[in-house]
Amino acid sequence: MALSWVLTVLSLLPLLEAQIPLCANLVPVPITNATLDRITGKWFYIASAFRNEEYNKSVQEIQATFFYFTPNKTEDTIFLREYQTRQNQCFYNSSYLNVQRENGTVSRYEGGREHVAHLLFLRDTKTLMFGSYLDDEKNWGLSFYADKPETTKEQLGEFYEALDCLCIPRSDVMYTDWKKDKCEPLEKQHEKERKQEEGES
């Protein structure tokens, strides 16, 4: 299975690289300790576009999302603390992502199956993307994240260029709206509780 995945990705490389030079951002690279350091901390979900209908439906309800990545380099896992606003309510969830270093992917079990995403970087180090089904033209898609809730025109431009590489219309992009976030109070409460626990220990 892993071998067939690698062969499929390798077969895509000439296609991706033959297009706009920025398509190189869609070529998965191995995840290193430096990579894990780079993604550590707080990230905001900005936008996404998927051809996969299941993923499209799941993101339509999202009004705002931010999360924290805390990697464990020894166990190749990432502790995820996620704050998501849907239907004007805050939903908090914590879980672990598995890191597949050689494939450049992270995965999470949800709904009884494993969801895999490629970790992709843009030129701006304050942004990142996750690519889904990059070996399946009928289902592939991208989600875009930044270290702040609002992005610059240049940052969004890089995301759009990546979508162009996959021939996904920009009209298909779904955006979040930080003004609709309902989770900031809960985040502050959690932060206060953590500081109290640290003080007691």
UniProtKB/Swiss-Prot annotation:
What induces its synthesis? Answer: Synthesis is controlled by glucocorticoids, interleukin-1 and interleukin-6, It increases 5- to 50-fold upon inflammation.
Any one annotated GO CC term: collagen-containing extracellular matrix
Where is carbohydrate linked to this protein?
Answer: N33, N56, N72, N93, N103
Q: Where does the protein principally reside?
A: secreted
| Signal sequence interval, chain numbering | 1-18
SUPFAM superfamilies from the entry? Lipocalins (SSF50814)
In-chain residues carrying the UniProt-annotated modification Pyrrolidone carboxylic acid: Q19
Post-translational modification comment from the UniProt entry: N-glycosylated. N-glycan heterogeneity at Asn-33: Hex5HexNAc4 (minor), Hex6HexNAc5 (major) and dHex1Hex6HexNAc5 (minor).
UniProt note on tissues of expression: Expressed by the liver and secreted in plasma.
Print the keywords alphabetically: Acute phase, Disulfide bond, Glycoprotein, Pyrrolidone carboxylic acid, Secreted, Signal, Transport
Q: One Pfam family for this entry, by name? A: Lipocalin
Location(s), subcellular = Secreted
What function does this protein fulfil?
Answer: Functions as a transport protein in the blood stream. Binds various hydrophobic ligands in the interior of its beta-barrel domain. Also binds synthetic drugs and influences their distribution and availability. Appears to function in modulating the activity of the immune system during the acute-phase reaction.
Q: Per its record, how is this protein called by name?
A: Alpha-1-acid glycoprotein 2
Gene transcribed to yield this protein: ORM2
